[in-house]
Amino acid sequence: MDEKELKLRKLLIEGASGFGVNLDDEQIDKFFAYKDVLKEWNQKMNLTAIEDDEEIILKHFIDSISICPIIKDKNLALIDVGTGAGFPGIPVKIVFPELKVKLLDSLEKRTKFLNEVIERLDLKDISTVHARAEEKGVDPDYREKYDISVARAVASLPVLLEYCLPFVKVGGCFIAMKGNSTEEVENSKKALEILGGKIEDILEFNLPFSDIKRNVIVIKKFRQTPTKYPRKSGKPSKNPLT
């Protein structure tokens, strides 16, 4: 193992431990295998603008691990909505192998990449679905079937709520990973009321070894989402519940 890899492993270990996550050697190896597949596939398709090893570890892996303290019980079903290159779903699965994870994305070529990662990392109880959130949110096989939904997406919080809360069982939660702005929370009161959610916690922090600000918003689902939500594809983003 060369000096560069030792430095990268140290970054991953220390970054994860900042969120109370102690990675063993097997988990670290899986993260590095994931990094290699990501860089390999990124040559032929646009998965991430982040290509530097340190930045992948910090802005993708450790950023994803930051939600692990919220997941109290490990034997749960989690859906990652608009997962893209697998964040945060795959890192969370590596940390908590017992979780049952579904990775949802609207681009088929991304789900092919994700299936390759799952196979190479030999991950169990994790699968992909190529679909839009609006389609699967009304599907009885998906609707209110998950303890946790997560999204690390650029859509506004009212839009994410309509995408993600329909998947969550009453009593479960939606974890929204946002940048450094909490102003969207004010604009989400109507969506929360309509969709059956309430804000339980807002975690504000900097990513380790950086001045990159993050906000993680935890929304508890306290009643069923009305059957007319989510609305048809495109509607939530064009006409948010604000």
From Swiss-Prot:
<keyword id="KW-0489">Methyltransferase</keyword>
<protein>
    <recommendedName>
        <fullName>Ribosomal RNA small subunit methyltransferase G</fullName>
        <ecNumber>2.1.1.-</ecNumber>
    </recommendedName>
</protein>
<dbReference type="GO" id="GO:0005829">
    <property type="term" value="C:cytosol"/>
</dbReference>
<keyword id="KW-0963">Cytoplasm</keyword>
<feature type="binding site">
    <location>
        <position position="152"/>
    </location>
    <ligand>
        <name>S-adenosyl-L-methionine</name>
    </ligand>
</feature>
<keyword id="KW-0698">rRNA processing</keyword>
<feature type="binding site">
    <location>
        <begin position="133"/>
        <end position="134"/>
    </location>
    <ligand>
        <name>S-adenosyl-L-methionine</name>
    </ligand>
</feature>
<keyword id="KW-0808">Transferase</keyword>
<dbReference type="Pfam" id="PF02527">
    <property type="entry name" value="GidB"/>
</dbReference>
<keyword id="KW-0949">S-adenosyl-L-methionine</keyword>
<feature type="binding site">
    <location>
        <position position="87"/>
    </location>
    <ligand>
        <name>S-adenosyl-L-methionine</name>
    </ligand>
</feature>
<dbReference type="GO" id="GO:0070043">
    <property type="term" value="F:rRNA (guanine-N7-)-methyltransferase activity"/>
</dbReference>
<dbReference type="InterPro" id="IPR029063">
    <property type="entry name" value="SAM-dependent_MTases_sf"/>
</dbReference>
<comment type="similarity">
    <text>Belongs to the methyltransferase superfamily. RNA methyltransferase RsmG family.</text>
</comment>
<feature type="binding site">
    <location>
        <position position="82"/>
    </location>
    <ligand>
        <name>S-adenosyl-L-methionine</name>
    </ligand>
</feature>
<comment type="function">
    <text>Specifically methylates the N7 position of a guanine in 16S rRNA.</text>
</comment>
<dbReference type="InterPro" id="IPR003682">
    <property type="entry name" value="rRNA_ssu_MeTfrase_G"/>
</dbReference>
